Regions:
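Short coil/turn motifs at beta-sheet boundaries
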Residues: 7, 56-58, 97-99, 114, ...
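Flexible, surface-exposed loop regions and adjacent strand-edge segments
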Residues: 1, 44-52, 82, 91-96, ...
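Generic hydrophobic alpha-helical membrane-segment signal
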Residues: 12, 18, 91-96, 113, ...
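Hydrophobic, lipid-facing positions within transmembrane beta-strands of outer-membrane proteins
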Residues: 10-14, 59-63, 100-106, 142-148
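Gram-negative outer-membrane beta-barrel transporters
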Residues: 2-85, 118, 127
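Short, glycine/charged-rich beta-strand-loop motifs at protein surfaces that mediate ligand recognition
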Residues: 89-96, 103, 107
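C-terminal beta-signal and adjacent terminal beta-strands/loops
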Residues: 80-87, 106-152
Length: 152
């Protein structure tokens, strides 16, 4: 990685959310979108002057939906990252493709005596998307996680 002396960013971000409760039911949503161009303005004599900063996508977005009922929670999230360059040279061969993941989580909270217990099962990367966040470092495919949390 490299530190850049001067970077200029120009973009637009939008966020929307909604929360609602009906008796024992709850709904929470959150959506984010960013369109942003980040460029290197460190040295006008440098051949990479005004090139896009590595790992800085033009487009990124997320959507989170959480449904709850009487101690249960079902949450899904969708994350998207657009094409981006791995190096400041901005060569096409150093382009990393866009990717998205969908995660799903089921959570239950309950009591055992005076203790609060939370059980969670998660499926991360539900669609088994093959992608690299950093060049040559592939991210895991579909994976599962079970968590049991006992608060004393």
């Amino acid at each position: 990685m490299v530190n850049f002396g001067l970077v200029k960013s120009l973009g637009l971000s939008a966020t929307a959310g909604y929360d609602r409760q009906w008796g024992k039911f709850s709904l929470s949503t959150n959506a984010n979108y960013t369109c942003q161009r980040d460029r290197d303005y460190s040295s006008p004599a440098d051949p990479e002057y005004k090139n896009t900063i590595p790992y800085s996508p033009l487009h990124s977005a997320s959507l989170i939906l959480d449904l709850g009922y009487d101690g249960y929670s079902l949450c899904t999230s969708w994350l998207y990252t657009g094409d981006r360059f791995a190096l400041i040279s901005n060569n096409r061969e150093d382009m990393l493709g866009d990717w998205y993941t969908i995660d799903l989580k089921l959570n239950k909270q309950f009591h055992i005596g005076k203790h609060n217990v939370q059980a969670t099962i998660e499926c991360n990367n539900l669609t088994d998307s093959r992608h690299e966040v950093v060049k040559r470092y592939p991210m895991p495919g579909r994976n599962w996680k079970f968590t049991l949390q006992w608060k004393i």
